[in-house]
Amino acid sequence: PGFIDVHAHLDGHMASGRRALLQGITTSFGGNCGLSPIDMEAFFDSQAEGFCVNQAEFVGHSFSLREEVGLKDAYRAATPAEIRQMEALARRAMEAGAWGVSFGLDYCPGCAFQGVEALGKLSAKMGGICPIHTRLFTMYDMYSISEAALLALNAGVQVQVSHLVYQYPLVHLLDEAFEMLEFAQDRGAHIACDSGMYTHFAAPLGSATFDLDNMEICDWKFDELLVSTGSHKGEWMTESLYRKLRKEAPGTEVVCFSGEDDAIAYAFTRDYVMPSTDAGNYEPGQGHPQAAASFPLFFRVLVREKRQMDWPEAVRRATLLPAETMGLKRKGRLSPGADADFVVFDPKTIDGRADFAGLGTPDAPPAGIHSVWIGGSQAVEGTKVVNDRLGKILKR
């Protein structure tokens, strides 16, 4: 079956959609990390002519809903009135077909759990799901994962912990995170996770993640940040460049080199963890290689090299597991009545070829993908997109 990416930021962006399609993804969930369209009806209408892959959307809390109600300060908690406004906007988005409310708590460190819980309860009441980019107060902070567990337990909502290895990029941190999540699961919490094939994460330079105080707390150095978009793409950060871009181009994406490689595979030692890309809105030749290489790398590293899982289990993680987790009854399987979304690949050669800006080509197509089909029609032949309008909007 076609691969299902539960955590991305395509949101109708064609260049990024083609990268997803070329690596075998046929369905992608956008609006993650608290960043999404607010007017879902208008967004869905804008996609009426089709897209590279099938798209499902969450409505985002931590950037989009907060900004829509006038909350521009990432360090200020919402008032009760602002929470009610966000609930009304989220309800409207879910009535239009959004799959739930997403959170990017790292990006609004001042938001109180009260508002998160309120939106979680709304999402649960409407049958939605809450992906959560957890809030890290330090690199070794486990309170962040407890917020995800509490959201599931207190709000009664299904929670998807986003890009697990980015949040907990050391093996011992993952052990602690798994222990806390499984404690909650044993008490009835419905929690799953997704994770990527890199520990080096990307975020906008102007976000709270890269505030100087937070960089000091996390012990990140300027020369560990690689610019991945814009006119300085491929350059390593300096203090002067940091100050210039924060002032003049805060949306510039940078990659923070952190974590340990062993954590990548270790994140998939639990059977409720599925692969994801965290792909952003990238113009050609720009961005993080995860947008072009994640799923092929998952198969190469976890199956062919490390033999951590066999082929049937790896395929399940990339197809049936996300379909069942998200409630996609016609996706993730090849059976009578299911949607004819599928990918044909060579298990001996499948691999990601993209690399970081300045070190390689961020959008290089993968190896080993023979063809990709959506709805019974061919979308990809080898490394060429032959039809980028087969994807449909999937409403909750």
Where are these regions (language model features)?
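C-terminal cap of metal-dependent C-N hydrolases
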Residues: 265-272, 277-278, 342-390
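Divalent-metal coordination cores built from histidine and acidic residues
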Residues: 8, 14-102, 189-191
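Metallo-beta-lactamase
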Residues: 2-10
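Active-site neighborhoods of metal-dependent hydrolases
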Residues: 58-59, 71-80, 84-106, 163-307
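Divalent metal-binding pocket/active-site signature
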Residues: 92-148
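Active-site beta-loop-alpha junctions enriched in small/polar residues
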Residues: 9, 13, 33, 60-64, ...
